[in-house]
Structure formats: structure tokens, C-alpha cells
From Swiss-Prot:
Monomer and homodimer. Part of the essential Sec protein translocation apparatus which comprises SecA, SecYEG and auxiliary proteins SecDF-YajC and YidC. It is found in: Cell inner membrane; Cytoplasm. Residues 573-592, 861-899 are annotated as: Disordered. ATP binds at residues 87, 105-109, 512. It is a peripheral membrane protein. One of its GO terms (molecular function) is ATP binding. Zn(2+) binds at residues 885, 887, 896-897. The gene is secA. SUPFAM superfamilies: Helical scaffold and wing domains of SecA (SSF81886), P-loop containing nucleoside triphosphate hydrolases (SSF52540), Pre-protein crosslinking domain of SecA (SSF81767). Keywords: ATP-binding, Cell inner membrane, Cell membrane, Cytoplasm, Membrane, Metal-binding, Nucleotide-binding, Protein transport, Translocase, Translocation, Transport, Zinc. This is Protein translocase subunit SecA. InterPro entries: Helicase_ATP-bd (IPR014001), Helicase_C-like (IPR001650), P-loop_NTPase (IPR027417), SEC_C_motif (IPR004027), SecA (IPR000185), SecA_CS (IPR020937), SecA_DEAD (IPR011115), SecA_motor_DEAD (IPR014018).
Length: 899
């Protein structure tokens, strides 16, 4: 009540922000006549002028009005597109390091050019991040014309580029690319043996398109570069054969003499939890598995791995459905993105789940992988000095954006008022009744010529609807993961008269649906059918298509615009809003309605009891529907619960990943300093002194007399580490104390290093230290990541011992990290003293081998955090098992990183 009153008096935060920006818009508008009077050369010359003024100390904020005015005029001349006033506000929001929520069709692609152009003036680079290669290429080519017209360079980072091409594209003023490519390039750079091989040049400013998809939907999906293990895949086939012999049971509550008066009873061999997407063996199931696998105790420590694989196989059979969670294509299990419905070639579920699904489907099983480098999108994007984003749906997740990324959301007003009515949900008892109503609605709109976009949440549901429409004789397009190659063309024509388009989870985001059709897209299809056509014929066809689409546009507007039909509510309100947002662009008419049933996943798992009670109370008969504000509210509450739960999971993940992030920063910073050759000898001597200090502490106890120290072990350790023979008489030992021993060892070791440097020369000595240090860091960092994975797997069990798993994880991860640092230090010192180098060519050959290995990029796989197994994994090609290991150890891959 009080907050509502305050908002009425002083306005909401969003209103106050917009009020602050409108005067700057007026200033930009006042500069428009001045910019229009400039020649093309003079307008281009403004970029060089801005760069000079910036170099002399003028801030980007001070340059903003003029720079935006120049960019707007450049867009008008080169693209035939003039930025609207609300788009200027969007550009200012991005420049301020915030998220601009802009409705579909409001021109987010053009808005990004304002902030990108202004920030490129600094010369530090701007990254524009998109969700797929198609959009990255399209936007870089399209908007690149504007940047080129204004004297800036544009690059694009997509799959398939080599390092030289990537380096050139990152060196451009503005670089477009996908989140995966940017993240993997960062990880690969930090595995290289020369700064000259790095492709990225820093993290200055990023504009993330579809920011909700990248920073929220994919936040639980870490990027991981990994190599295969040498484990046998036979176990998956063996365990897969016993799963069909297990019977699914359920959990029942029965009366009992307990505090609550009830106890849980488990029937069958296993139970499933759909919310957690997990499956658990019952006592009866454990006995049956032990009998089938011929083992005595499934919970014996030696059989824990077998138990894990049984649970994963249960999940594969009971929870993961073909054509819903994955498809089988060309002998491969391909994951379906639960948010977009697209296939994700190369992504793999982690922790043996993908292998379990492969065994279930009878396809070839790929071996599991070991992590070599990893980062989450959350921590990758937080490295940028300034981060901003755009989306049509961010306000529902504003709290998460602020808490995790420190990003505020500004809702940008539409250029024209929104005319789309969103009708209340219609709810049926069964899915069959719901689909019948959906078909009836589609048929009604089709017969009058109004285009419809029908959203489904899975490939399976889209194909069911398609079959029902086919039986009714209604022509339509199906846009799901199986046809993602054509999605842009199909979506572009979804606003044509009588067009019926079924889309899985709004695949095709980033392509506008224009009422009446898109003439450019029609021309593209015509060109494919007429490859011999001349430029004059193409120009004539384009004009014909423009007239045709303009006439059809008016007809479709008169019919009510694009009608949106949702066939199921998603767990997130944001995904539902994305579907609705495809209609009503730029003031066009449109409408939307969702059809639901009590058998839908969201209602069945999270909210059906309350809705079912209301339907029973109102005596709703079969085939009848209910539309009521109470039910809409109940569904929204279920969605809010799921959103809050998912937010907690992502926050939980970042709390854990922050520990690893700090460790990763230390290691990667140290690697870069070594590659840059900064104080390499000094760093090595510090390592040497620390190693000596550790040895003295281990063998020279102050409470014992020097003659009682373990001189045999001490001498062996000193010789092993420093190649120094300790020759001390009893009299000399008797006079020593711990400090004296440490000083003596330091003097001898430093003198030995000096002699070695004199023999090799300072340059070659530093070269040797650098190569040995990098080798030690990379080998032990890889092992550390494996140890951290193992720590994560069991850390949740600490809660049973009344301990906080998060605090235990932080403490033990720190201990593991310090142990790794000591191992790196000792190995570096030992190798520098012992490695045999006779001439410069020896070490150059050693380094060249390492550089060559680093160029063979590893298998890049994105897998989920162990605690969130429902998330997928992404992969690229790796080195062979018998090739030299890319970590630089000199061993074969299968004997080193591939163990």
C-alpha cells in the first residue's frame, strides 16, 4: 500500500530513469540537422575526431550525444534505417552497463550499434554476443555495413575458424560472436604456450543479445574443455540390460507410531522424483540388482561406481524420453534444448548419463571425459569491465540479474502502443480435449485467413499437433529441432495470410515475424530456385515481392494480425512471454491465448491439485473448459515457485563456482606472467626458497638436537630436489640450527643455479624455467580440476554430519589448491636442476613441441555441474589416444590426460 502510494508520487525507478534520459534524446535530436548537412566523408571523419578527443581525456559519456547522432545518420544513409527516439534510450541503457528490455520487433539489433559504436571509440574492442552462429553472421554483415561506413572494422567469431582468423576478428573494433565461442576461446587461450598464440585481446565491453537466454537459461551449463578417459564402456551395456527387469514403484504415506503419525513406504524396485529428475532404488530394488549383477553388497565402497551407473541408467530409462529430451539421428543421441527446442549437436550430459542413454538406445557409446579447463558463463561474463544486454523479457528476472551480475533492468517504452490483447488461459481436464480445442481455434483462424503461430514445449507435442492438422487438411509448417536449418526462413514468413506455423519453444528467436511476409526472405528463396537469374531479374522480383507483401500486410492487419496459441505453460513466465511477444510488433494488431490441461507437466507436478479441486467444485464435465482469474493466479504462483527454485540452484552454483573462479584467476594470471617473461628468474628463486623452507620444516625440528634430525632422508630430499650432495661433519651439524640450515641450503642452491645460468646463458636459462613452469602448472591444474570434481560429488553428504557443505567445500578446495601450488613449486625446482639441456636447439625443440600441441585444440565439451544433472554438454573434436598429450608432459595422451 505504502510502496504504491510512493510510486504514484515520485514514479517507479524505471520511470525516473526514463525521465533522466529524455533530455539527452532531445539533445541528440537537436544535432540531427547538423549531421544531415555533412558529406559522407565528413560524417566518417567524425569517428577519427571522436578518437582523438577521447585520447585527450574527453569521456565517452561526454561524446555520447554527438556519437549517437553520427551513428543515427550513418544508419539512415547506409541501411535506410533511422534510430527511433526509444532506440536512442535503449542505446544509452546499454552504454550505462544495464539491460534494456525491448519488446519483439523494436529493433534490438539496430539499438546495439549505438552503444557498440560509442564504446569502440576507446579502441579497446566491443563484443556483441548472440545465441547462434546464424545471428552472429547475419548481424555482423548487416550492421557491419554501418560500422564500415563510419570507418570502423567488424569481425565475427563462429565455429570452424582457425586461430589466425579468430585473432584477426578479435582485433576488429567490434566483434560479433556466440557465447560458446567467446568462452571456449578464453579457455583455449589459457592453455597456450605463447602470448603470440592468444586470440582474444581483453574484456572491455560486451553487449549480450537475448541476455536472458545466455545469462539465465544457460547459466547452469559450464563450458568445459576435456579429454577422454581410458575407461571401458562395457559396464553401460551390462547395467542397461538389467534395468527393464526392474519395476517402478511409488512412495506412499501410511499411518505409523511416529511424531508425525505417518511414515513413508516404498513399493517396487525404484521410485522417481520428477521435480528433481532423479530415480532411486528401493531396498527391494537393491537386493534385485545385487542378484542380477552377482555382487554381495551394492553399497560396498568398491561398488559405489556401479551404484552410480545403475542410478544413471534408471534416470535414462524412466526420466529421459526420446523425441522430448533427445532425438536419435545417424546413430547419435542428440540433446534437445529444453528452452528453444533446438538440437544441440556435440553437447553431452555429464556424469555417465549420456552414456546410459546411448546404451538404452543401442547406439555406440562414447567414453566419458576428464576436465582440462572450465568456466561458467556467469564467471566468464563477469570478467568484462562493462556488461550490458538486450532482450524482450528481462523484468521477471530483474532480481537475479541484479544479485548475480549487478545488472539493472530498464524497460524501454515501445515506439508505438502495444495493441495485442492477451486472453485468459483456457484449461481442460485432459490433453486430448486441449488439443481438440487448439485444432478448432487454428481452423477458425485459418478459414478467415488470419496467420497463427502455435507454441509447443517439445518435438513430440509439435508432431502430434502436426498430425492432427494434417488430418484436418490444414497446410502448415513445423519448426522444431529437426528443421533448425530452415527456421529463420519459416519464421520470417509466419505472418503471411493463412500461414500456420508450429514452433517448439520459440525456436527462431532473433528473426522478426512481419505481417504479410518478408520480401527479402522471399527473394532469397526465389534465388535458390533460380540460380541463373540476373541482377536485373532479382531487382524486379524484389519489387514485386515488396508490393505483394505490402498488400498482404494490410489484409492481415484487417484480420487481426498474428494470433499466438500456446499449448502448454512453461516453467518460466519469461518463456511464455517470449512466445506472446512474437505478435503485436511495432504497433501491429495481434492476440494470444494459452490452452492448458491438468495433464500438462507444470500443472501435474506443481499445481494440479488446487486447479483440479476448483474444476470439481465447479462440476466441469469432460470436453468443457474453464477460464477463471483464480486458476490463472494459481498457475502463475506455480511458475513463480519454479522460478524461485531455479534461481536458488543458479545462486548455489555460483557460490560454489566462485571458489574455483578465484583459483582459476590465480593460475591463469600466473601463466600469462610467465609467458610475458615478467621477473621469471625472481619468481623461480622465490619458489626455490619456499621449497627449501618446506624441507627444513619437515626434517629440522627445533625441539630436537641437530644430530637427532633425520639426516639420511634430508640428504636424499636435497639431492633429489636440487642435485646437491650434503657433506657435513658431526661438528658442523652440532653447530647448526634450523635457520642456519636453511641459509646454508639457500646459498648452495642459489650458487648452483648461478653456475647453471653461466653455462647456458641467461636467455636460455629463463627459457628453460618458463617451459618447465608452464608444464608443471598445466599438468597439476588438470589434476586439481579432477580432484575438485571428486570433492563436489561427495560434499553434499557432509550435511548428514551437521556440517555446512558449502563451508566444507570452500575449506577443502582451498587445501587442495595449496597442495597443488606446493606440487607445482617442487616439480618446477626439481626439473630446472635436473633437466639435461646442452644447447639452445634442445629447449627450442621442447618448446616447439609444446606450442604445436597447444595448437591442436582439445575436445571442447560443455557439461553441467554435478549437482544439476539435467543440464547438457557441448563438444568438439580431440587429439587421438596415441598422440602426444596436449598438456606438454611428453607422454602419450592415453597415459596422461586420457587416464
Amino acid at each position: 500500500m505504502l510502496s504504491t502510494l510512493i510510486r504514484k508520487v515520485i514514479g517507479s525507478k524505471n520511470e525516473r530513469e526514463l525521465k533522466r534520459l529524455w533530455p539527452i534524446v532531445a539533445k541528440i535530436n537537436s544535432l540531427e540537422p547538423q549531421m544531415q548537412a555533412l558529406s559522407d566523408e565528413e560524417l566518417r571523419g567524425k569517428t577519427a575526431e571522436f578518437k582523438e578527443r577521447y585520447s585527450k581525456g574527453e569521456s565517452l559519456d561526454a561524446l555520447l550525444p554527438e556519437a549517437f547522432a553520427v551513428c543515427r545518420e550513418g544508419g539512415r544513409r547506409e541501411l535506410g534505417m533511422r534510430h527511433f527516439d526509444v532506440q536512442l534510450i535503449g542505446g544509452m541503457t546499454l552504454h550505462a552497463g544495464k539491460i534494456a528490455e525491448m519488446k519483439t520487433g523494436e529493433g534490438k539489433t539496430l539499438v546495439a550499434t549505438l552503444a557498440a559504436y560509442l564504446n569502440a571509440i576507446s579502441g579497446k574492442g566491443v563484443h556483441v554476443v548472440t545465441v547462434n552462429d546464424y545471428l552472429a553472421r547475419r548481424d555482423s554483415e548487416w550492421m557491419g555495413r554501418l560500422y564500415g561506413f563510419l570507418g570502423l572494422t567488424t569481425g565475427v567469431i563462429v565455429h570452424g575458424l582457425d586461430d589466425e582468423q579468430r585473432r584477426a576478428n578479435y582485433a576488429a573494433d567490434i566483434t560479433y560472436g556466440t557465447n560458446n565461442e567467446f568462452g571456449f576461446d578464453y579457455l583455449r587461450d589459457n592453455m597456450k604456450f605463447s602470448l603470440d598464440d592468444y586470440v582474444q585481446r581483453g574484456f572491455n565491453f560486451a553487449v549480450v543479445d537475448e541476455v536472458d537466454s545466455i545469462l539465465i537459461d544457460e547459466a547452469r551449463t559450464p563450458l568445459i574443455i576435456s579429454g577422454p578417459t581410458e575407461e571401458s564402456t562395457d559396464k553401460y551395456y551390462v547395467i542397461n540390460q538389467i534395468i527393464p527387469r526392474l519395476e517402478q514403484g511409488e512412495v506412499k504415506e501410511v499411518e505409523a507410531n511416529t511424531l508425525s503419525g505417518k511414515k513413508k513406504v516404498y513399493t517396487g524396485d525404484f521410485t522417481i522424483d520428477e521435480k528433481a529428475k532423479s530415480a532411486t532404488l528401493t531396498e527391494q530394488g537393491v537386493s534385485k540388482v545385487e542378484k542380477l549383477l552377482k555382487i554381495e553388497n551394492l553399497y560396498d565402497p568398491r561398488n559405489i561406481e556401479t551404484l552410480h551407473h545403475v542410478n544413471q541408467a534408471l534416470r535414462a530409462h524412466a526420466m529421459y524420453r526420446r523425441d522430448v529430451d533427445y532425438v536419435v539421428k545417424d546413430g547419435e543421441v542428440l540433446i534437445v534444448d529444453e528452452f528453444t527446442g533446438r538440437l544441440m549437436p556435440g553437447r553431452r550430459w555429464s556424469d555417465g548419463l549420456h552414456q546410459a542413454v546411448e546404451a538404452k538406445e543401442g547406439v555406440r557409446i562414447e567414453s566419458e571425459n576428464q576436465t582440462l579447463a572450465t568456466i561458467t558463463f556467469q564467471n566468464y561474463f563477469r570478467m568484462y569491465a562493462k556488461l550490458s544486454g538486450m532482450t524482450g523479457t528481462a523484468d521477471t528476472e530483474a532480481e537475479e540479474f541484479h544479485k548475480i551480475y549487478k545488472l539493472d533492468v530498464t524497460v524501454i517504452p515501445t515506439n508505438r502502443p502495444l495493441l495485442r490483447p492477451d486472453y485468459p488461459d483456457v484449461i481442460y481436464k485432459t490433453e486430448q480435449e486441449k488439443f481438440a480445442a487448439v485444432i478448432s481455434d487454428i481452423k477458425e483462424h485459418y478459414e478467415k485467413g488470419q496467420p497463427c503461430l502455435v507454441g509447443t514445449i517439445s518435438i513430440e507435442k509439435s508432431e502430434v499437433l502436426s498430425e492432427l492438422l494434417r488430418k484436418q487438411g490444414i497446410p502448415h509448417f513445423v519448426l522444431n529441432a529437426k528443421q533448425h536449418e530452415k527456421e529463420a526462413e519459416i519464421v520470417a514468413q509466419a505472418g503471411r495470410k493463412k500461414a500456420i506455423t508450429i514452433a517448439t519453444n520459440m525456436a527462431g528467436r532473433g528473426t522478426d515475424i512481419v505481417l504479410g511476409g518478408n520480401p527479402d526472405s522471399l527473394l532469397k528463396q526465389w534465388r535458390l530456385a533460380n540460380p541463373e537469374a540476373t541482377a536485373e531479374q532479382a531487382a524486379a522480383m524484389l519489387e514485386q515481392y515488396r508490393q505483394q507483401c505490402a498488400a498482404e500486410h494490410d489484409e492481415v492487419v484487417a484480420l487481426g494480425g498474428l494470433h499466438i496459441i500456446g499449448t502448454e505453460r512453461h516453467e518460466s513466465r519469461r518463456i511464455d512471454n517470449q512466445l506472446r511477444g512474437r505478435s503485436g510488433r511495432q504497433g501491429d494488431p495481434g492476440s494470444s491465448r494459452f490452452y492448458l490441461s491438468l495433464q500438462d507437466d507444470l500443472l501435474r507436478i506443481f499445481g494440479s491439485e488446487r486447479v483440479a479441486k476448483i474444476m470439481d467444485f465447479l462440476k466441469i464435465e469432460e470436453g468443457e473448459a474453464i477460464t477463471h482469474a483464480m486458476i490463472n493466479k494459481s498457475i502463475e504462483n506455480a511458475q513463480k515457485k519454479v522460478e524461485a527454485h531455479n534461481f536458488e540452484i543458479r545462486k548455489h552454483l555460483i557460490d560454489y563456482d566462485d571458489v574455483m573462479n578465484k583459483q582459476r584467476e590465480v593460475i591463469y594470471t600466473q601463466r600469462r606472467e610467465i609467458l610475458a617473461g615478467e621477473d621469471i628468474r625472481e619468481s623461480f628463486l622465490e619458489m626455490l626458497d619456499d621449497t627449501i623452507s618446506d624441507i627444513v620444516k619437515a626434517y629440522a625440528f627445533e625441539k630436537d638436537a641437530p644430530l637427532e634430525w633425520d639426516w639420511e632422508s634430508l640428504s636424499e630430499t636435497v639431492f633429489r630436489c636440487f642435485s646437491i650432495q650434503l657433506e657435513l661433519s658431526r661438528e658442523m651439524i652440532a653447530r647448526l640450527n634450523a635457520d642456519g640450515l636453511q641459509k646454508m641450503l639457500q646459498e648452495q642452491a642459489h650458487e648452483s643455479i648461478k653456475r647453471r645460468a653461466d653455462e647456458l646463458g641467461d636467455e636460455l636459462m629463463d627459457h628453460l624455467i618458463r617451459v618447465v613452469m608452464l608444464q608443471a602448472i598445466d599438468v597439476h591444474w588438470k589434476d586439481h580440476l579432477l580432484n575438485i570434481d571428486h570433492l563436489k560429488e561427495g560434499i553434499g553428504l557432509r550435511s548428514y554430519g551437521q556440517k555446512d557443505p558449502k563451508q566444507e567445500y570452500k575449506k577443502e578446495a582451498y587445501q587442495l589448491f595449496m597442495e597443488m601450488i606446493i606440487r607445482i613449486r617442487e616439480e618446477t625446482v626439481e626439473k630446472v636442476f635436473w633437466v639435461q639441456i646442452e644447447k639452445e636447439e634442445d629447449i627450442e625443440e621442447l618448446e616447439e613441441e609444446q606450442v604445436e600441441r597447444s595448437r591442436k585444440m582439445f575436445k571442447a565439451i560443455t557439461v553441467n555441474d554435478d549437482e544439476h544433472p539435467a543440464e547438457p554438454a557441448k563438444s568438439q573434436k580431440n587429439a587421438g589416444r596415441n598422440e602426444p598429450c596436449p598438456c606438454g608432459s611428453g607422454k602419450k595422451y592415453k597415459k596422461c590426460c586420457g587416464k
